[in-house]
UniProtKB/Swiss-Prot annotation:
Main location: secreted
Record-given protein name: Mambaquaretin-1
Cellular-component GO terms for this entry: extracellular space
Species per Swiss-Prot/TrEMBL record: Dendroaspis angusticeps
Biotechnology section: Is a new promising drug for aquaresis-related diseases, including hyponatremia, and a molecular probe to visualize in vitro and in vivo V2R expressed physiologically or under pathological conditions.
Purpose of the protein: Selectively interacts with vasopressin V2 receptor (V2R/AVPR2) and fully inhibits three major signaling pathways of this receptor that are GalphaS protein, the interaction with beta-arrestin and activation of MAP kinase. Inhibits vasopressin binding human V2R in the nanomolar range (Ki=5.02 nM), and also potently inhibits vasopressin-induced cAMP production (IC(50)=94 nM). In vivo, this protein shows an aquaretic effect.
Record family assignment: Belongs to the venom Kunitz-type family.
Taxonomic lineage: Eukaryota, Metazoa, Chordata, Craniata, Vertebrata
Length: 57
């Protein structure tokens, strides 16, 4: 799995409400979170399928 999968979930400082998904190393699963729309990090996916395909394997 790519190293960015191990980054912590980071909603970012902006106030948008965008549905996104991140990989949790602790649970070895993808979870939903609300992305604010700016900054954040690479551990953010638009669909749970993309998250699973990239980080869970």
């Amino acid at each position: 799995r790519p190293s960015f999968c191990n980054l912590p979930v980071k909603p970012g400082p902006c106030n948008g409400f965008f549905s996104a998904f991140y990989y949790s190393q602790k649970t070895n699963k993808c979870h939903s979170f609300t992305y604010g729309g700016c900054k954040g990090n690479a551990n953010r996916f638009s669909t749970i399928e993309k998250c699973r395909r990239t980080c869970v394997g």
